[in-house]
Amino acid sequence: MQNPAPAANLPREWIDPATGHRIVQLSTEPGTNSLYFTQYAYTAGGTKLLMTSRRGIDLVTIATGEIEHVHEGHVGRVIQTGRRTGAIYYDQGGFVYALDPATRTSRQVAKLPSNGTAFAINCDETLAAGSYTVGETDHPELAPRRPQPPPGGYKPGDPMPGGDNYPDKHAMMDRRLAARLPMVLFTVNLQSGECKDVLHTTDWIDHFQFSPSDPTLLMYAHEGRQWKLDRVWLLRVDGKSQPMLVHQRTMRMEIAVHEYWSNDGQWIYYDLQTPLSEDFWIGSYNVYSGKRIWYHLPPNHWSVHYNTSPDGTLFSGDGSDPDPAVHYAAQKDAKWIFLFRPELIVNQPGETPDQENMIQVARMIPERLVDLSKHDYSLEPNGNFTPDGKWIVFRSNMRGPIEVYAVEVAKAK
């Protein structure tokens, strides 16, 4: 990658002295963000990454670092890039728009229900999924009490505080869960504009993710403090099935959280703790065979988010803060971008005849990629693999302002 030097004479590319891996700063404007780790953010062909900046929407060519500004101005919410066309979908003013990166023009593709928000686009770009709250939507007592910006707002170049964790977050989640507000999960057809109510519930539902390969299969989450509920669910949005629970807790204080799809849509992965803050796994479930594999993590390697390489052979973790006020599962010396290589634990002779129906266990062999000792984890790094599997993209405030970075999976020569 070739990039101009950023302000303050900081290098845009360097070898991390603690790990020997090459790091590149992809963004050039302070305050630039990558998307949440489950939101697909690559254009068709996988060569360009979507980033959001104060100016609007940018694309960066991963191989060269070249940045294209493709949309001027703030949009309500970037949903993802389309897996088929590479269009950038966003939700603004009650409508879903598709931005063509080549022409830099947007077109309105669907009108949302009143109070509706779109969260996911399916793999063939025919449906969007979202939710809305039924009836009265103004509940200030349930709103997050986030840190407020300074008078006049943030100025270009100002460090912007991360909004992923804040002092009132856990109490807010308890208030919202207890409220049992009626909600609707809906789909909207991006060709005809037809809206369908798919699920009515008083559970707090969120984190909608369509399968990367199956256009009617949707994963979603029951929100709230994770040890109080069974979180990860699957649903056919064509009405041909009832919601199916992916992981059922069997232990007090057990949690399954931060779920995501494998690149081929075969597996669901999630952060599994048995119990919270004590024993750490990456749980997995094959949606077609029902097979389960639990990958055990060594101490002090728990990460806020995990991700899996496109070929399914490697995993990443974006580390965690040692302060339990920031993360329940506080770990010592875990402020790193990690690479994990899975190793199946070999079955011993004489196992029971029904062992094929049991959970397969594996261990993770860790490697440190990026030293995040100066990163403030109130901003979650949201690490994810590039489509070629050669880089892990993440965001960080480790050098002050929020910027977007990539670390090379292979160690520098």
Model regions: which residues?
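Loop/turn-rich, solvent-exposed surfaces of beta-rich toroidal or solenoidal domains
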Residues: 271, 277-280, 296-364
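Beta-strand-rich domains and repeat architectures in extracellular enzymes and scaffolds
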Residues: 2-13, 18-55, 208
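Blade-loop segments of beta-propeller domains
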Residues: 36-38, 54-97, 112
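Asp-box/WD-like beta-propeller blade repeats and closely related beta-sheet repeat scaffolds
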Residues: 74-76, 83, 90-184, 193, ...
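Blade-level signature of beta-propeller repeat domains, shared across WD40, Kelch, NHL, RCC1
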Residues: 380-413
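Structural motif
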Residues: 56-59, 94-98, 137-143, 180-184, ...
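Hydrophobic beta-strand positions that form the internal "hydrophobic ladder"
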Residues: 49, 87-88, 127-128, 217-218, ...
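Blade/loop signatures of beta-propeller domains
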Residues: 1-24, 174-186, 352-360
